[in-house]
Amino acid sequence: MTLDLIKIRRDLHQIPEIGLEEFKTQAYLLERIAEMTEGKDFVEQRTWRTGILVFLHGSAPEKTIGWRTDIDGLPIVEETGLDFKSIHEGRMHACGHDIHMTTALGLLDQMLQVQPKNNMLFLFQPAEENEAGGMLMYEDGAFGDWLPDEFYGLHVRPDFKVGDIATNTNTLFAGTCEVLVTFKGKGGHAAFPHEANDALVAASYFITQVQTIVSRNVDPIQGGVVTFGSFHAGTTNNVIAETAEVYGTIRTLTQEMSLLIQKRVRQIAEGVAASFGMEVDIMLKQGGYLPVENNPALAKELMAFFDASPMVNLIDCLPAMTGEDFGYLLSKVPGVMFWLGIDTPYALHHPKMSPNEEALAFAVSEIGKFLKYKAED
């Protein structure tokens, strides 16, 4: 069947939902998938919470090729002014997952036309933005014997043009780790500091000392980011703060570097707390947001394939410090992620982010050729 990609994308754009709450999205996808797979006896389907797995049995399979899309939206008030803007107040597809889903449906439709030689799995994964849905599905055994031998996926990129595909043969996205540190001192009157134990001062020392991690502990060739964007302590001007809470993020291009920085954050927090004679709670939450590390051989193959197409402008790009939970699945299954240009002036997660819909036909056509090649390889 021929899909109306623009209509599908606009339908999905209107119903963004937060991770693991994508009930309308799942229902819409299931309806489209049912229409596409009717009468196809080589197709099986499973659901996992709000996720969907569609498996195409190959005619003479030697491996399973996987394609993954995320399906969740963001808690953002949309400001695009589009006729098909979000009908869910305070929710928006500001990260392009509506484009991702539509592309996946278009690719699935192409692969259904003739039974492929190899098995194929199409994964519609929930909760990329908030709960690392890929990790949750893997740990819960959702894949079973459908786990791919190779996994592929894309992410839209606003500053690249339609026709651009960008990736590299190593790390594409950073791994991320949330950091929440709470210093617990003793409150008191500002006029009697000797009777209190100022948590605000302790947290300030901590913030200053963690600046040495990147400058003195991290290999400058590898790099890393430690940023604290939130600091809360005290209630008014003349009361010494009993507690102080700092909230931040770690970004690294390798998991080894992430573990080193996490270790140093913990050591510094515990050291500062000890020097002030107070308690400290430390929360380090990485979960499934590991670095997105492309398999070098598969990435080289994919890049050579797209480079040979006159329709594709292939870009060998540098890594980005943004996070993506596809990194967890790529830590279990070799594969490749790449950027797809959507040519819009607004960045990802911006309330006015609006992709150029011409990217849809391009993506389905060019990526479809690659998947057909992999299906027969």
UniProtKB/Swiss-Prot annotation:
What is the protein name stated in its UniProt record? Answer: N-acetyldiaminopimelate deacetylase
Q: Which GO terms describe its biological process?
A: diaminopimelate biosynthetic process; lysine biosynthetic process via diaminopimelate
The domain of life for this entry's organism is Bacteria
Q: Give the matching PANTHER family.
A: N-ACETYLDIAMINOPIMELATE DEACETYLASE, PEPTIDASE M20 FAMILY MEMBER
Please provide an example of a Pfam family that matches this protein in its UniProt record.
M20_dimer
Q: Which organism is it from?
A: Streptococcus thermophilus (strain ATCC BAA-491 / LMD-9)
Q: Which residues form the active site?
A: 70, 129
Enzyme Commission code: 3.5.1.47
- Pathway where it operates: Amino-acid biosynthesis; L-lysine biosynthesis via DAP pathway; LL-2,6-diaminopimelate from (S)-tetrahydrodipicolinate (acetylase route): step 3/3
What's the family?
Belongs to the peptidase M20A family. N-acetyldiaminopimelate deacetylase subfamily.
For this protein, what reaction is catalysed? N-acetyl-(2S,6S)-2,6-diaminopimelate + H2O = (2S,6S)-2,6-diaminopimelate + acetate
Q: Which InterPro entries match?
A: AcetylDAP_deacetylase, Amidohydrolase, Bact_exopeptidase_dim_dom, Peptidase_M20, Peptidase_M20_dimer
**One annotated GO molecular function:** N-acetyldiaminopimelate deacetylase activity
Keywords linked to the UniProt accession:
Amino-acid biosynthesis, Diaminopimelate biosynthesis, Hydrolase, Lysine biosynthesis
What function does the entry list? Catalyzes the conversion of N-acetyl-diaminopimelate to diaminopimelate and acetate.
Q: Which residues form a coiled coil?
A: none
Report TM segments. none
Q: Quote the HAMAP family the UniProt record gives.
A: DapEL
